[in-house]
From Swiss-Prot:
Pathway: Carbohydrate metabolism; tricarboxylic acid cycle; fumarate from succinate (eukaryal route): step 1/1
Protein name in UniProt: Succinate dehydrogenase [ubiquinone] iron-sulfur subunit, mitochondrial
Subunit structure: Component of complex II composed of four subunits: the flavoprotein (FP) SDHA, iron-sulfur protein (IP) SDHB, and a cytochrome b composed of a large and a small subunit.
Cofactor: [2Fe-2S] cluster; [3Fe-4S] cluster; [4Fe-4S] cluster
Catalytic activity: a quinone + succinate = fumarate + a quinol
Classification lineage: Eukaryota, Amoebozoa, Evosea, Eumycetozoa, Dictyostelia
Binding-site positions, a ubiquinone: W211
Function of the protein: Iron-sulfur protein (IP) subunit of succinate dehydrogenase (SDH) that is involved in complex II of the mitochondrial electron transport chain and is responsible for transferring electrons from succinate to ubiquinone (coenzyme Q).
Binding site for [4Fe-4S] cluster: C196, C199, C202, C267
Membrane topology: Peripheral membrane protein
GO biological process: one example: respiratory electron transport chain
GO-annotated molecular function: 2 iron, 2 sulfur cluster binding; 3 iron, 4 sulfur cluster binding; 4 iron, 4 sulfur cluster binding; electron transfer activity; metal ion binding; succinate dehydrogenase (quinone) activity; ubiquinone binding
Residue positions binding [2Fe-2S] cluster: C101, C106, C109, C121
Protein location: Mitochondrion inner membrane
Organism of this sequence: Dictyostelium discoideum (Social amoeba)
Amino acid sequence: MISNVLKRASVLARSNGIQSAFYTTTAKTEASSSPQMKIKTAEKKDHFVNFQVYRYNEETTAKPYIQTYNINLKDCGPMVLDALLLIKNNIDPTLSFRRSCREGICGSCAMNLNGSNTLACTKKITDCLSGDTVKVYPLPHMHVVRDLIPDLSHFYTQHKSIKPWLEPAVDVPRYNGKEILQSKENRHKLDGLYECILCACCSTSCPSYWWSEGGDGGYLGPAVLLQAYRWIADSRDSIQKDRLAILSEDQMKVYKCHTIMNCTAVCPKGLNPGKSIANIKYLLAHN
């Protein structure tokens, strides 16, 4: 019955000189494909920018140096990572840096751009220009493997020390193919925590972390402490006391935070590690 009604409506529309949506769409498509109907797009203008890039290779040079590349923004995409890829692919294949997702998810391309830590894949070139120059450095106060690649080994060791995984209660079946459920309220407590991508922008912008001693002790830094609180706050976890005990073994792991808040200022995901550290301090004082 419905199909008959549609057919009658179509016949009536044509008899009244009204085109159906199909014919209208077809006509528009044919018109747009016509050479006379093509829309002219504005051509990109030349815009040259100097990229001053930190270079270091312990195999070929004893000291780091700055190398300048003159790039026409007309030839690359809008992000700093686009310019670095242009340099590597077309100008200097020896330039080394990390990159992967190109959409602010993996954290691989974290670096220091004009004095501020951020992700090269989400930072527009025009947003970090100083005159006609962009200064590109590796994350500060880290050993440099090569060029823009920092050594994050110690950072990952610290992250491992907080047991960054879920430890459910013993009586919760682990391998029955079902989720460990939690209420909406408890799930909401993880907002602003689980989004951390461990890019290390916050930790390497923190003076307290710069002054921290290496090895197993010392200040854990904002990124690792935010991750620590992420698991402490998870209602599905059963070892909150153990996690707090790990953090209280050495007071400097947490209390070396002096609320400078560089961490919150530079986080490319808009998170607040300083708040997480304050919450940990509160729990340590009341447990």
